A protein has these predicted regions:
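Non-core capping and flanking segments associated with repeat-based/extracellular domains
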Residues: 1-260
Length: 260
C-alpha cells in the first residue's frame, strides 16, 4: 500500500492557507512553523493569532501555554528533561476547561525552551505575556539566566504567580532579582517562604491585586511609601496616587490587597 499522499498546503493561495490554519491548534501551528524558513514565513503572515493569550509556566518542566478566547481549551507545550515523557500527550480537566499538554524531551530543556519561546513570540506577535507562573526553586542553577532571558524577551507580564517547592531553599535573592527585572502589570501572587527580613525586592506599583502568603518578613512600610492611608474595619485603605483606593486584608498566613 502506498503511504497517504501529503496534503500540498504550501501550494494553496494565502486565503486558503489561512482557512487551513484556523482549523489548527496552537501546537500544530508551532510544529508547522518550525519545519522550515518557508513555513515559518507563512505562519508569521496569519492575522488571527491575537485571539490567543499566552503564558509561561516554569516548574518541573518549562511550558508555553496558549488559551483561546471563547474556547475552553488550553494547550501546553512542555519541555522536559525526562526522556520517557517525549511525545506524550496529557489531557486534564479543570473548572470545565480542558488542558492539553504535549511533552518534548530535551537534553537542555532551559535552552531549548528559550529558543522555542523566541520563535513562538515571533509567530504569534507577542510583546507581552499574559501569565507567568514560576516555581522559583526549580532550575536553581539557571535562576539568573532565566530571569535575564525573560527581561530581554518580554516587555511585561500581566499576572504573575510565584511558587516554591521546598521551604528549605532560600529564594530571597532570586525573588528580589525577579521583581527588580520583570515588569508586572496587574496581579502578583506570591506563595514563597521568604523569611529574610532584609529582603529588598521591589514590589511593583499600580497592581490591581497583590496577594502574599507567608509574609512574616514583609513590612507594611514597603507598600505605604507612596500613598495616603487610613485604617478601616476589615482592612487598611490606601488612597493611591491615581485616585483609586486599595484595601489591605491581613490573614494569618499573609495578606492581600485589592484595588477598587
Ligand atoms: C510543580 O510540580 C510538582 C510535581 O509535579 C507538583 O506537585 C506541584 O504542584 C507543581 N507546582 C505548581 C505550582 O504547579
Ligand atoms: C508537535 O510536536 C511535538 C514535539 O515534537 C510532538 O510531540 C507532537 O505530537 C506534535 N503535535 C502535533 C499535533 O503535531
Ligand atoms: C541563584 O540560585 C543560587 C542557588 O543555586 C543562589 O545562591 C543565588 O543567590 C541565586 N541568585 C539569584 C540572583 O537569584
Amino acid at each position: 500500500m502506498n503511504p497517504p499522499k501529503p496534503f500540498p498546503i504550501l501550494c494553496l493561495l494565502f486565503l486558503a492557507i489561512e482557512e487551513v490554519f484556523k482549523a489548527l491548534d496552537p501546537i500544530e501551528i508551532i510544529n508547522f512553523s518550525i519545519i522550515s524558513k518557508r513555513t515559518k514565513g507563512i505562519a508569521k503572515q496569519m492575522s488571527f493569532f491575537p485571539k490567543y493569550s499566552m503564558g509561561l509556566f516554569i516548574n518541573e518542566t518549562l511550558d508555553i501555554m496558549f488559551c483561546g478566547t471563547g474556547d475552553m481549551v488550553s494547550w501546553f507545550y512542555a519541555m522536559t528533561s525526562d526522556i520517557k515523557m517525549d511525545g506524550k500527550i496529557e489531557e486534564d480537566e479543570s473548572d470545565g476547561c480542558i488542558i492539553r499538554r504535549v511533552f518534548k524531551y530535551s537534553k537542555d530543556p532551559v535552552e531549548e525552551w528559550k529558543q522555542l519561546f523566541k520563535h513562538v513570540r515571533e509567530i504569534f506577535k507577542k510583546q507581552t505575556i499574559d501569565v507567568l507562573r514560576i516555581t522559583v526553586d526549580s532550575f536553581l542553577g539557571q535562576n539568573v539566566s532565566i530571569i535575564e532571558y525573560l527581561k530581554v524577551n518580554m516587555k511585561s507580564v500581566d499576572l504573575c504567580y510565584l511558587f516554591q517547592t521546598n521551604y528549605i531553599n532560600n529564594v530571597d535573592k532570586h525573588t528580589a532579582y525577579l521583581l527588580d527585572n520583570i515588569k508586572i502589570i496587574s496581579e502578583l501572587t506570591h506563595y514563597l517562604y521568604t523569611e529574610n527580613y532584609d529582603f529588598d525586592g521591589k514590589i511593583p506599583k499600580n497592581l490591581q491585586h497583590l496577594c502574599i502568603y507567608n509574609s512574616q518578613w514583609f513590612g507594611f512600610e514597603r507598600l505605604l511609601i507612596h500613598d495616603e492611608t487610613k485604617e478601616i474595619s476589615g482592612g487598611i485603605d490606601i488612597r493611591k496616587i491615581d485616585g483609586k483606593t486599595a484595601t489591605f486584608f491581613v490573614h494569618y498566613t499573609g495578606f492581600s490587597m485589592s484595588v477598587h
